[in-house]
Amino acid sequence: LRASQPVKIMENGDMFVYKETVNKHDYILVADVAKGRGQDYSTFSLIDISTRPFEQVAVYRNNTISPLLFPNIIYKYANVYNKAYCIIESNDQGSVVCNGLYYDLEYENVHVESAIKANAVGIEINRKSKRLGCSALKDLMENNKIKVVDEQTILEISTFEAKGQTFEASTGNHDDLVMNLVLFGYFVSSAYFANLTDINIKDMIFKQKLKAIEEDIVPFGFIDDGSEQIEKLQNEESEDPMRRQWQISYDREL
């Protein structure tokens, strides 16, 4: 992983832009929500899914913003990036942000898990979905399917570790930006993403691994039993007029 320098720093140093919006490109905004009390950070990452590999193009990180105000920041930059599709972690304070963005600000391009169930805006992260997201993110990174350029995100990835049955930041570190990518990994490996974009991540990774295996296989050798050389000599003899005459005379003597 290699960090890049942002082309713009906005929102009083909380918003880092690495690439400007590209016309007709599709973007996904993934957000992790904190309480805004100076401890954990409310974050989001904007990811361009029209490029190969997918590319992180902007990051927001703030540990004092209220969940009541965070939807306004998301709304602002989701619109800037071609009405980005928003995937928000809905646990605890996350539901406040989900509902604020979807209902109060009437931003429709938000992931909704169920059209029937109440409070279904966003994605609820539990132990199972977190494990699946971590596994999917690992596959994306190992197979170069996502380009991470933000320095703080890379730092958090380096201190993200397994603890028991889950994954989290090592003692004294944060994982809020990593959780953006975990949420992204969980979503892009789902059937919903495949239907939404016609991009099947699992199939792409499987084909890449299969190709790598095929390239590593040593080709089977050929056994030279001399048959090719014998056939060549026979052809040469049949084309030699002296050889044909000798054969005829030999047959007559018999």
What are these regions (language model features)?
Residues 1-115, 121, 131, 135, ...:
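RNase H-like, metal-dependent nuclease domains and their acidic two-metal-ion catalytic environment used
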Residues 124-125:
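Phosphate-backbone recognition surface of nucleic-acid-processing proteins
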